[in-house]
Amino acid sequence: MRKPIIAGNWKMNMNPTQTTEFVNAIKANLPKFDQTESVIGAPAVDLPALLEAAKGTDLKVAAENCYFEEAGAFTGETSPKTLNEMGVDYVIIGHSERRDYFHETDEDINKKAHAIFKNNMTPIFCCGESLETREAGKAEEWVSNQVTEGLKGLSADQVSSMVIAYEPIWAIGTGKTASADQAQEICAVVRQTVAKLYDQTVADKVRIQYGGSVKPANVKEIMGKEDIDGGLVGGASMEPASFLDLVHFND
C-alpha cells in the first residue's frame, strides 16, 4: 500500500516570517505521518525558517531545486550536500517552469536526481506535456520519454523510493484542471514506463502525484484514482486552511 503524499510547492512566494506563521497555523492539525505524508516545498531563503518551525512535527520539507554539483564556482546555485546537512527531506526537480524558463534539459534533471540520492534526500521528479503536445496526440509518448530520460542510471531501490509528479503544463496556474480521468490516464502511463524500465515491483512502489490546479474541491476525486498517490499543489498550498483540507482529503 503506497502512502499518500500531498506536497505544497510555494514557487517564488512567502518570506521567512510568513513561513513560520504558516507552519504554526497547521502543525497541530496535520494528519499522522503513517496515514498521509504532508510536505511543503519552499524557496531556498525560507528553508531555515521552515525547518525550524517544522521540528517535532509530521511536516516534511522540500527544496524547490538544487544543483547537481556539491560545491564550487556555481554562483547562485544551491548545493544538495548543504540541503541534506540542513535537514531537507525532498527536492523538487524537473518542474516545467525550470525546464521552460531556465532551459533545464532531461540530462540536467537526471544529474540532479543522482546528486539528490547521493546526498540522502528524495527527488520529486516532475514531468508533463504542453497543450500543443496533447492536442497532437503525443502526451503519452512525451511523458514516457521524460520519465525514461529522468531515471537513467538510477537503481531499482532508488526509483522505488522516489516520487514522480505528473503536471500537465496546460493545467498549471491556468485554472484548467485535467479531469481526474485524464490525470489517471497519464499517471498510469508513468507507472507502466517504470515497469518497463525496471519491473512491476518497482512500479508498484513508486509514488505518483498529480499536479495542476489541485484544490480542496477536487482533491478527493483525484486521489481516488488507482495510480494517483498524491498531489503537488501550488496556489492552494499557501493558505493554512486550504493546505489542511488537502492533507485531510481522506477524512
From Swiss-Prot:
Per its UniProt entry, which superkingdom is the organism in? Bacteria
What do the Gene Ontology cellular component annotations say?
cytosol
**E.C. code:** 5.3.1.1
Q: Which InterPro entries match?
A: Aldolase_TIM (IPR013785), TIM_sf (IPR035990), TrioseP_Isoase_bac/euk (IPR022896), Triosephosphate_isomerase (IPR000652), Triosephosphate_isomerase_AS (IPR020861)
| EC class name | isomerase
Keyword Repressor among UniProt keywords: no
Q: In which pathway does it act?
A: Carbohydrate biosynthesis; gluconeogenesis; Carbohydrate degradation; glycolysis; D-glyceraldehyde 3-phosphate from glycerone phosphate: step 1/1
Q: Where is the active site?
A: H95, E167
Matching Gene3D superfamilies: Aldolase class I (3.20.20.70)
* UniProt record similarity statement: Belongs to the triosephosphate isomerase family.
**Which HAMAP family does the record associate with it?**
TIM_B
The record's function comment reads: Involved in the gluconeogenesis. Catalyzes stereospecifically the conversion of dihydroxyacetone phosphate (DHAP) to D-glyceraldehyde-3-phosphate (G3P).
User: Subunit structure of this entry?
Assistant: Homodimer.
- Name recorded for this polypeptide: Triosephosphate isomerase
